[in-house]
Amino acid sequence: MGSEMWYKRQTLDSANTIADGTAVKRVGDRIFEYAKKNIDQMLTVEDDELVGAFLDMVENHKMIVENSGLLTVAALKQLDLKGKKAVAILSGGNMDVITMSSIVQHGLIQRDRIFSASVLLPDKPGQLALVAQTIADAQGNVIKLEHNQFVSTNRNAAVELRITMEAYGTEHKNQIMKALEEKGFRPREIGAKLY
């Protein structure tokens, strides 16, 4: 935000964010005056950036920090700090297990480490095994399969297979999709859902 924002308090219509510990529609009088005097720059952070920061902290630092406490980490990623020293203040670990699980899953999906694809298969023996082997040969890992025989009015013509898989990232995901394509499965990426 520009410096002009410091001189007028804003009131938001809503404060809907996963950083619920800092979600306010209007900053308090004392905090606003303190911030105006002491803060040089203000950055905004999207929920997707917080999800990425949470996943980084869990995977790389083995720390659980609540979303509001990760605002500094997510904001620092927006700045060019290469070769500079910076300190991010981390606070809070007040997060329930369901929320943690949801954030980790969203982070893995964001980074293409979990993705889903749909393929149409001839309804004949061995097709499911061939798909599974193709994914395994590409070093992918199947998490979930949904086999739908009723996608076509002529179920003997084709069945739909929805596959949720693990990959190492975008490049690996693309390799798995290419391997399926090369076997003639014509995969189509669909939104990943783990539940």
Regions from the PLM with identified roles:
Residues 1, 8-37, 77-122, 132:
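Glycine-rich phosphate/pyrophosphate-binding loop at beta-loop-alpha junctions
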Residues 2, 30, 53, 130, ...:
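Short Gly/charged-rich anion-binding patches and loops
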Residues 18, 38, 59, 67, ...:
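A generic structural signal for well-ordered coil/turn residues at beta-strand boundaries
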Residues 18, 22, 26, 46-50, ...:
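Glycine-rich beta-alpha junction loops
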Residues 26, 58-61, 80, 94, ...:
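Alpha-helix capping/termination and helix-coil
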Residues 28-84:
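Active-site-adjacent helical/loop segments in soluble small-molecule enzymes
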Residues 97-195:
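A conserved regulatory-domain signal marking ACT and ACT-like small-molecule sensing domains
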